[in-house]
Every structure is written in structure tokens, then in C-alpha cells.
Regions:
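Conserved alpha-helix/loop element of class I SAM-dependent methyltransferases that forms part
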Residues: 42-61
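Class I SAM-dependent methyltransferase SAM/SAH-binding core
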Residues: 64-122
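A short acidic, Gly/Pro-enriched loop at the edge of an enzyme's catalytic core
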Residues: 121-134
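A short SAM/SAH-binding and catalytic strip from SAM-dependent methyltransferases
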Residues: 133-146
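A short glycine-rich, Lys/Arg-flanked "PGG" loop and its adjoining helix->strand segment in the class I
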Residues: 147-159
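Conserved beta-strand signature within the Rossmann-like core of class I S-adenosyl-L-methionine
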Residues: 160-168
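Short alpha-helix
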Residues: 178-193
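Core SAM-dependent methyltransferase catalytic element
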Residues: 204-234
Length: 234
């Protein structure tokens, strides 16, 4: 009896591990389950809605999501930009492309959403731009060269355009300290890639979600600020 329980527990651990390993690149049956978990876990839904609200997307905005998963944030963004804006998304998982396309079928048919299978280090030329806003939720840790890729994304942002990067550490034993450290690392990456930091927000989940907001510097606004700044007395 004890041996049967141990075998059952071992199988359960193996199944859970297989699903967890799928979150970076969902595929096959386990990937389908991972997509279902991402779409239906209440904390994920709350997290995505919160990040979109922080980005303050406006009607007519052109918005890009990197790593859209099952398409929850894409759906929220499409509602916010309305008929005059457009939402783009890339994800390197064919499974997530199918799930997100089904979830956003009406917006895609209406020409308001465009989803593409592509990794962040191979942005397709057809992606368009410049964008008013870019966001990514829990995908940065899978990027191979984050500073370089953030710099490439910044070049797709209009001057003054903003980016939101959210992280909710899912490693075993993650705490508020883990989230805080993740925020500091993301802030450093953004500054190294040429962004101007705006602010960092925290959502009180377990573990906490951090969202770092930054902007692509606007050269004209910077020049105006420098002209208006008081000159030191000679």
C-alpha cells in the first residue's frame, strides 16, 4: 500500500513538473494544459488586467505584447483601443498562438488584432510600428539577450512611448524579496537599453507582482526641458 502511494506521488510530481516546464514554450498535451492553467488561474487574470491598466492604453493606440500566452491581455487591450487602435502580439509557441487566436477570434476578424508566431529575438519585419506601448508579462526571464532585445523594442516605440514589464516569480519559495530583486534587475536592464524609468508598481499577490514602467526618451521633449531650465548665474 505504501509503495503504491509513493508511486502515485511520483507520477503526480512528474506530471506537475512536465506542465511547469511548459510555461516557457507550451507544446503538446502538457502545453495545452499549461495554457489552460494560464488562462484560468485567478491570479493570472488579475495580474494581466492590472498590468494593462497601468499601461494606460488609449483609443487609437498601437500596442504590442511580447509573449501573449493564451491571449488574456490581448483581449483586454483590444477592448481598450477600440475600433481605432490596433493590438499586435508575438509568441514563439504555436500552441499559444492557437489558443490566443480562438480567444480573440472576433477582434482578429474585425482587423483590430494581429497575432504572429515569432521569438522576441526575431521580430518579423511585417510587425509594423512605431508602437505607442509595449508590454510583456512573465516572459523576460526566457529571453536570451534581454538588454539587446529591449533595445530593439525601444526602437519600435514612438518617442515618448512606454513599456510595461511585469514579473511574478514562480520559483519555489518565492517571496516579496524575490519580487523586489526581480524589479531591480528589470530596472537595470531597461536603463542599460536606453529607456527612462517612470515608476515601479506592486500588486499584492502571493508572491507579489512587480511592474516596471519606462519610456522611450523623446529628444524634442528633452531639448525643450533643457532650454527651459534656469541657467546658473555667471
Amino acid at each position: 500500500m505504501a509503495r503504491n502511494r509513493e508511486q502515485a506521488m511520483a507520477v503526480r510530481r512528474a506530471v506537475i513538473a512536465a506542465i511547469v516546464n511548459q510555461f516557457g514554450h507550451p507544446r503538446g498535451t502538457a502545453g495545452r494544459v499549461a495554457g489552460w492553467v494560464m488562462a484560468h488561474r485567478s491570479s493570472n487574470r488579475q495580474r494581466n488586467s492590472w498590468v494593462v491598466s497601468l499601461l494606460d492604453v488609449q483609443p487609437t493606440d498601437r500596442v504590442l505584447e511580447i509573449g501573449f500566452g493564451p491571449g488574456l491581455a490581448i483581449a483586454e487591450l483590444a477592448r481598450r483601443v477600440g475600433d481605432s487602435g490596433h493590438v499586435y502580439g508575438i509568441d514563439h509557441s504555436e500552441m499559444m498562438l492557437r489558443q490566443a487566436s480562438r480567444r480573440n477570434a472576433a477582434a482578429i476578424a474585425a482587423g483590430r488584432v494581429s497575432l504572429t508566431r515569432a521569438p522576441v529575438d526575431q521580430l518579423p519585419p511585417s510587425l509594423g510600428g512605431p508602437f505607442d506601448a509595449i508590454l510583456t508579462v512573465n516572459s523576460l526571464r526566457f529571453w536570451l539577450a534581454p538588454t539587446q532585445q529591449l533595445d530593439q523594442l525601444r526602437r519600435r516605440l514612438r518617442p515618448g512611448g512606454r513599456i510595461a514589464i511585469a514579473s511574478q516569480p514562480r520559483c519555489p519559495g518565492a517571496t516579496a524579496s524575490t519580487s523586489h530583486n526581480a524589479a531591480r534587475e528589470i530596472e537595470d536592464l531597461l536603463q542599460d537599453a536606453g529607456y527612462t524609468l517612470m515608476r515601479t508598481e506592486t500588486l499584492d499577490l502571493d508572491p507579489p507582482v512587480v511592474c516596471i514602467l519606462a519610456a522611450n526618451p523623446d529628444p524634442l521633449a528633452t531639448a525643450d526641458h533643457q532650454r527651459q531650465a534656469p541657467h546658473p548665474a555667471g
